[in-house]
Amino acid sequence: MLLVAFKDPRITRIAKVNLIGGQAKPGPQLASIGINMGEFTKQFNDQTKDKNGEVIPCIITAFKDKSFTFEIKTTPVTMLLKKAANIKVGAKNSKTETVATISREKALEIAKTKLVDTNANDEEAVLRMVAGSAKQMGIKIEGVDPVVHKDGKKK
């Protein structure tokens, strides 16, 4: 999408920003994109009011006439894992420290949420991606080994 969009001469900028759902405000992060910030924040907050307080990635396409389009992505895996594990930060040393454990069901729920934003074909593949992120944060997922591949071999 991004490469095709730059062929359109009306586009001035494509930016990826992380905003708080339902709480976006005009500011320097949006000013540099060159869009009508008031209109953008109104539309963004309306579309993300059900995700109030969550970090929401958003891809904004700005046009020469100050108009814009935007695409809302799903919340980052790290945020979803912290929420599921009920923690504020991950482990300082994830190789030796485990800060929380979550159930396979919670991890699968996160994988289903992220399935639309990945290039994976099935939930199990996304579950392994989620498990890898969890491992880096010091979060253990019951019954999931992030280093076992489909063929059963360990990395």
UniProtKB/Swiss-Prot annotation:
GO terms for cellular component: cytosolic large ribosomal subunit. Forms part of the ribosomal stalk which helps the ribosome interact with GTP-bound translation factors. Belongs to the universal ribosomal protein uL11 family. This is Large ribosomal subunit protein uL11. It comes from Malacoplasma penetrans (strain HF-2). One of its GO terms (molecular function) is structural constituent of ribosome. HAMAP family: Ribosomal_uL11. The gene is rplK. Part of the ribosomal stalk of the 50S ribosomal subunit. Interacts with L10 and the large rRNA to form the base of the stalk. L10 forms an elongated spine to which L12 dimers bind in a sequential fashion forming a multimeric L10(L12)X complex. GO terms for biological process: translation. InterPro entries: Ribosomal_uL11, Ribosomal_uL11_bac-typ, Ribosomal_uL11_C, Ribosomal_uL11_C_sf, Ribosomal_uL11_CS, Ribosomal_uL11_N, Ribosomal_uL11_N_sf. CDD domains: Ribosomal_L11 (cd00349).
